[in-house]
Structure formats: C-alpha cells, structure tokens
C-alpha cells in the first residue's frame, strides 16, 4: 500500500508458546481503532466512521474480526479489576513511551500497536474468593491498590507484566484495553490494545506471561483468560500518507531487522492460528505488507 521502507520493528507477530498457554498469531494488514469517551458518540459517530471506512475499502479488504468494547464501571475489566492502572496518564508521559523518536526518523511520531482478543471463563473465575482473585491479579479488587511485594505471588498478573531493565528503569506502555461481551452468547473478554515505541517491551511481557521467567512461572490469569487473536501493527503519524516515498518496500519477516535488536527474548514459536470466524487466514503474499489478508486483486 505504501512504497517506503517499513518501520524498523514492523514484522509479523510471532506466536509465543509455553507449556500450557499460547499467545497465538492471527495476522492482519489493517487495524482501525475507533473510540469515543461518550456512549452516544460511540453509537453514532464511531459506527458511521466504521461504515464509511469499509465502504471506501469495498473489494480491497476482507474484515476478519470486529469487536465493540465499552467502559465498564470505573474502567474495570469483566473480571472486576481496574484495567490499565499503570498506563501513563498525561500526554507527555504517554508520548515518551509510545511514540517512535530519532531512532527511526522516517517514522518519528508513529507508534507500534499489539492487539490481542482474550476470552474469559467467568464461571470459573467467579467461583474463586475475592482473596484468591487478588492473589492472581496482584491488586486489591475494590481499592485497586497493588499488593505488597511480600504478599504478591511471583506468578500474579502484575508481577508478570512488570518489566525492569538491568539499569533499574521500569518499562511502560500505553494501554487502551476494552472489555467486551454478549450475555446471550455467553462470550466475555478483554481486547488488549498496547501502544509502544518498541514492540519488544510488550513481547517481553507476553513471554513472561505465557512462557514464564523462570520458565514455567506463567501468569495465573491465563488459567481463566485465553488469547484467540494476536497481531502487530504500526500506527503512522498523521502526515504519513502525504510524504513522497520512492523506495520499494522491504519484505516482512518474523526476524528483527539488523541494527534494531528487540528488547524481548526470542519467543517460542507456535502454529499460526485461524481467524476468530474459523476461516483460515489468507496466505502471506509478497506484493502486500506480507502480514495478513489484504486483497490486492483490486487496483486503486
């Protein structure tokens, strides 16, 4: 779609497989994250924008998943805990961790985004006591206060997703997760959306969750939440499409480009999963971005 060299860390999302749980890969070419802070705007403007986008892309893409999220109480997930507590709150803090900088000047101001759709076993979760749930998450349920280190399990969700560099720097990402669900169908989940200047940060979080550090010390929340999708995208700066780009695009591979090492350990590979609809995903083609199901048979 765009004939410039790809962003330094843009590649197919590599599945991460542990002994019991797998972060699956379900590649796609385009992600539209449409959000509003008011319900009436979600129902009106967000729907209309989505409708117009798909009309403009008619025949060029095949939608493989659509999720309608919502705000649940005081920004809680359907497990009952506040979600995104550690996400940066100010624009300045968010920009510092989410936006690409001088390390990749052609894409400065853009951001990588990893998305995963998790389905929850709420029946099993709700059979636990609040104290058991708090040990799994690593926070008090009502107050959202993090448990003291002495009381926090090493395989709690908070412990698994805390990334500390060797120099003591805590690595953050911008989370914009959405709870979703349909009571009639009995489907309840969390749509994880993580923005970062370096996808290796999220990949290391996922490695700690699904494989464990040390190996086997996996995130207990995965006993109740199953990842059914997983994909890595790049969100370009607003003026991206207006820029001239005479250079042919580079092919997408699963490997990190030379000169841009990731901060994550090498993930354990697992088979590429099918789309949530049960239909197999399109074969990767060399004439597209190479990471999904974009239909290039139509010319624009």
Positions of PLM-derived features:
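Long, histidine/aromatic-enriched segments associated with O2/redox biology
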Residues: 1-272, 276-292, 296
């Amino acid at each position: 779609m765009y004939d410039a060299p790809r962003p330094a860390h843009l590649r197919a999302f590599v599945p991460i497989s542990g002994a019991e749980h797998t972060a699956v890969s379900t590649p796609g070419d385009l992600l539209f994250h449409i959000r509003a802070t008011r319900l009436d705007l979600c129902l009106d403007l967000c729907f209309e924008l989505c409708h117009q986008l798909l009309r403009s892309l008619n025949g060029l893409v095949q939608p493989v998943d659509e999720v309608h999220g919502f705000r649940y109480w005081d920004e809680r997930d359907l497990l009952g805990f506040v979600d995104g507590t550690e996400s940066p709150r100010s624009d300045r803090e968010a920009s510092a961790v989410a936006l690409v900088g001088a390390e990749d000047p052609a894409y400065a101001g853009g951001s990588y985004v990893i998305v995963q759709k998790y389905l929850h076993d709420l029946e099993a979760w709700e059979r636990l006591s609040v104290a058991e749930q708090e040990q799994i998450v690593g926070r008090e349920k009502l107050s959202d206060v993090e448990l003291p280190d002495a009381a926090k399990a090493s395989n709690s969700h908070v412990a698994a997703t805390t990334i500390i560099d060797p120099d003591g720097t805590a690595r953050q990402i911008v989370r914009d997760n959405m709870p979703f669900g349909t009571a009639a169908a009995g489907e309840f989940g969390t749509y994880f959306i993580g923005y970062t200047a370096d996808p290796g940060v999220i990949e290391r979080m996922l490695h700690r969750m699904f494989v464990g550090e040390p190996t086997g010390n996996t995130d207990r929340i995965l006993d109740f939440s199953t990842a059914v999708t997983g994909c890595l995208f790049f969100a370009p700066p607003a003026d991206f499409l207006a820029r001239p780009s005479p250079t042919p695009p580079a092919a997408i591979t699963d490997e990190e480009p030379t000169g841009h090492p990731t901060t994550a350990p090498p993930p354990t590979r697992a088979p590429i999963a099918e789309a949530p609809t049960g239909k197999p995903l399109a074969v990767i083609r060399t004439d597209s971005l190479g990471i999904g199901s974009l239909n290039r048979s139509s010319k624009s």
